[in-house]
C-alpha cells in the first residue's frame, strides 16, 4: 500500500512539474539576460500560486508609497488535517513558552531585494519559487515564506534605468559603461530615499511597517535576507 501511495505522489509531482511554466517560459526571456519589473514578479508569483494545487498562496500584506503591491508566497507542506492557521497559533504559543505540538513544521522566511539596485535578488527569488513549487519535497512538513522583493519602488527605479541603458545581453563588465551609473536617484532606497535595510528597528517607513506586521504574525524560526556583493 505504501508503495502505491509513493508511486501516486511521484506521478503527481512529475505531472505538476510538467504543467508549470518556468520563469523563462512565463516572462519570455532567460533569467539573467535582463532585469524583471516588479509587476512581472507579482504576476509570476500569482501564476505559480494558482498552479500549485494548494501548495502555495500569494498573500498581499500591503502597498508601497508608489502603490506597488507587497506580498509573500506562503509554501506549505502540512500533515493531513492541519491548517496554516493551526501552525501559526501553535508557533505563537511556543514563543510564549506554552505547551505546543512538537510535530508541526518548521517555519522559514526568505527575503530578497531590500536594496533595489541589488536587483539579482528578485531574479533568484523567481527561480527559487519555481523550484520549490514545481518540484516540491513531500517527505517532510514545512512552511516557507518568500518575499521576492522587499523594496519594489527602489527596484523599479533601478530596473527602468538599467534596461534603458543596457545594450548587451547579460550586462557590460566595463566599469565606465553608463549602465553602472544610476544618476541622481539611486534604486538602493525607497521612494523617500530611505534605506529600508536600516529601518528594521525604527520602522519609520510604510514598507517596513507592513512587512514586520506580516513577519510577527509568523515569527519564523529562520530568516535569510539575500543581498548582492560588489
Task: Please report, for each region that a protein language model flagged, where it lies by residue.
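N-terminal signal peptide c-region/cleavage motif recognized by signal peptidases
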Residues: 13-17
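Acidic/histidine-rich, surface-exposed loop or edge segments in extracytoplasmic proteins
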Residues: 19-33, 110
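Conserved phosphate/anionic-ligand binding catalytic regions in large, soluble enzymes, centered on
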Residues: 115
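A non-catalytic alpha/beta surface segment that caps or lines the substrate-entry region
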Residues: 38-80
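Positively charged n-region of N-terminal signal peptides that target proteins for export
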Residues: 1-4
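Carboxylate-rich, divalent-cation-coordinating active-site regions
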Residues: 74-103
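Active-site/substrate-binding loop(s) of hydrolase catalytic cores
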Residues: 96-111, 119-230
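Short, solvent-exposed loop/turn elements at domain surfaces
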Residues: 35, 81-84, 118-119, 156
